[in-house]
Amino acid sequence: VSSQLINIQPLSQPVDLNVAPATFSPDVEAEIDRHLAKYPVKRSAILPLMFIVQRERGGYLDPAGVLYLANRLTLRITDIWEVATFYSMINTEPVGKYHIQVCKTLSCKIRGAGTITEHCSSKLGIKPGETTADLRFTLSEVECLGS
């Protein structure tokens, strides 16, 4: 069965398609071109390009960035969104200047990750998944970053 025909996962959140694709400076476009040249199949460049677009779009992959990637890689928007929502290092919402990510897996919880999350939450006055009012800190629980 062709991978183009399989798309049974619903989007975890809607993407506003009433935007124009992002545009970038010639330097950023050249950086993207260099990455694309490394891969014989354009789709294989999806993660490096997501990191570039995220960096250039204010620290997260916004709808305009998603549309840009879909156009540039000749992929469906759902293909881009599935990858973006799978990896915890791709932000699909704005995050604070300092993004604190604490592992939520059992092995890290046993070693004290829960205590770290509770301490950060207490000091910052936010719960995991939230950003401080001054947009300085975001606290997130993620899959293990060390494995």
Say what each PLM segment does.
Residues 2-147:
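Signature of N-terminal electron-transfer/Fe-S-associated modules in redox systems
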